[in-house]
């Protein structure tokens, strides 16, 4: 059986202005690729909008003979539009030519296919409540309850005795790895190993585990003080991080309903960069975000605040922008706003932003109340760093996230942009995602 090859196919500008049932390619190209088999996987690429459509499983024998009677050098291949022509952001790096074909490898094919799946399919939502409590005999009892609201109602409930000492041992090893490595390439197998232990401890019920891994979903976590520190992003099954198919949202059941934001310019973004001698790549990060906005012709206005802040300066920015991107140092008890001020939490916001992206270390620490306070104040989505992040090491995640979020011709939410960015970078970083998704998806 011949291997099915995968391709990106270009058409011309006029093709995408109408609903066409055929792809046009030169006969000479068809003759070359048909040697490898009659079936190919293909995406359609629109250069003007930097969008990719598909995927199509194309039978090269299924030609539109009525059109192929023309005496020109083109063949017309019938297609079925699998995904209703909703495309994802994509930049073709090779020289663009109309009616051409570019071969891609299997890894690229599945990455692009997964991205289109995400954009075009409804995402399952699961609310997951988890706690560790003492029974009358003083034993630790682990409890969880899961309620899935889409695509159908599904409820799972479980409780059992919990070996807290074993968990502490696994968590201690997680912290050791987290603090000693900025890139997970060397330690990915160790993270998967301890993630597999945690999965067996936390989700022991096989039927529910299989259900959880069936399709892409967002799992909204509601955790008590004993389970908040569980590193959900490293949970692993079958030698893979389950975060490859699941976004764990650290919501603690706050801010599930949208906020009524008043007097807010929804096309404004602020970048807060706190000056520090040890942060040398902030200018590069700022330039990348600005270049994304220019390249995509987005109407977003971006203001830069490259200075130290006090509490009131910081709150003023939060209340006047729809997106706030923060570049600073993170500590176990908060983020640095100035040399003598660490921000641990905020109080109420009159006009909260839709999205706050905190590019700082250690945002997962239990003593750091900033994430939870932002969500409680009405911020829809907070994306935050986990563990030790070397300066500038994950800039490609940030670039991919905003490229997808700001794409003028594709309306996607923050969860979809987060996951598409993960698909982009996971082949370069073997480890788990080093940015957490907190809150609920938001359109900006």
Segments from the language model and where they lie:
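Contiguous surface segments at macromolecular interaction interfaces
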Residues: 2-6, 14-27, 53, 61-120
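Caspase-like cysteine protease fold
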Residues: 243, 250, 255, 337-351, ...
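Short acidic/histidine-rich active-site segments
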Residues: 380-393
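Non-catalytic, solvent-exposed interaction/assembly segments
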Residues: 117-220, 224-227
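Flexible, low-complexity linker/boundary loops enriched in proline and small hydrophobic residues
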Residues: 118-124, 192-197, 234, 332, ...
């Amino acid at each position: 059986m011949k291997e099915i090859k995968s391709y990106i196919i270009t058409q011309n500008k006029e093709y995408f202005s109408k609903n066409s049932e055929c792809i046009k390619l030169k006969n000479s190209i068809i003759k070359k690729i048909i040697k490898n088999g009659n079936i190919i996987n293909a995406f359609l690429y629109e250069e003007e909008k930097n969008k990719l459509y598909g995927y199509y499983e194309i039978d090269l024998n299924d030609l539109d003979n009525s059109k192929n009677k023309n005496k020109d050098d083109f063949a017309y291949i019938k297609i079925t539009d699998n995904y209703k022509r909703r495309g994802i952001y994509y930049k073709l790096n090779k020289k663009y030519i109309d009616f051409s074909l570019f071969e891609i490898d299997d890894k690229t094919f599945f990455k692009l296919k997964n991205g289109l799946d995400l954009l075009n399919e409804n995402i399952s939502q699961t609310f997951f409540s988890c706690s560790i409590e003492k029974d009358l005999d003083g034993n630790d009892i682990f409890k969880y309850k899961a309620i899935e609201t889409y695509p159908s109602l599904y409820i799972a409930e479980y409780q059992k005795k919990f070996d807290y000492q074993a968990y502490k041992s696994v968590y201690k090893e997680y912290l050791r790895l987290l603090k000693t490595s900025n890139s997970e390439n060397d330690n990915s197998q160790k993270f998967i190993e301890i993630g597999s232990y945690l999965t067996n401890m936390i989700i022991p019920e096989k039927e529910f585990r299989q259900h959880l891994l069936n399709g892409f979903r967002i799992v909204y976590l509601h955790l008590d003080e004993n389970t908040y520190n569980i590193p959900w992003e490293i949970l692993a099954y079958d030698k893979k991080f389950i975060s490859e198919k699941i976004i764990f949202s650290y919501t603690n059941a706050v801010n599930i309903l949208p906020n009524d934001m008043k007097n807010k310019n929804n096309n404004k973004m602020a970048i807060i960069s706190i000056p520090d001698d040890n942060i040398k790549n902030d200018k590069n990060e700022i330039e990348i975000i600005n270049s994304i906005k220019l390249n995509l012709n987005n109407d977003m206005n971006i203001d830069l605040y490259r200075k130290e802040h006090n509490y009131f300066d910081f709150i003023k920015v939060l209340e006047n922008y729809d997106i706030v991107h923060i570049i600073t140092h993170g500590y176990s008890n908060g983020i640095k706003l100035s040399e003598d001020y660490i921000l641990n939490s905020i109080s109420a916001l009159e006009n909260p932003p839709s999205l706050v992206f905190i590019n700082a270390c250690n945002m997962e620490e239990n003593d750091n109340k900033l994430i939870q306070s932002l969500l409680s104040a009405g911020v829809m989505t907070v994306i935050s760093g986990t563990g030790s992040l070397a300066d500038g090491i994950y800039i490609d995640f940030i670039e991919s996230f905003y490229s997808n979020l700001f794409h003028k011709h594709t309306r996607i939410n923050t969860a979809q942009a987060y996951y598409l960015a993960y698909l982009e970078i996971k082949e370069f970083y073997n480890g788990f995602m080093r940015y957490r998704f907190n809150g609920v998806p938001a359109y900006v």
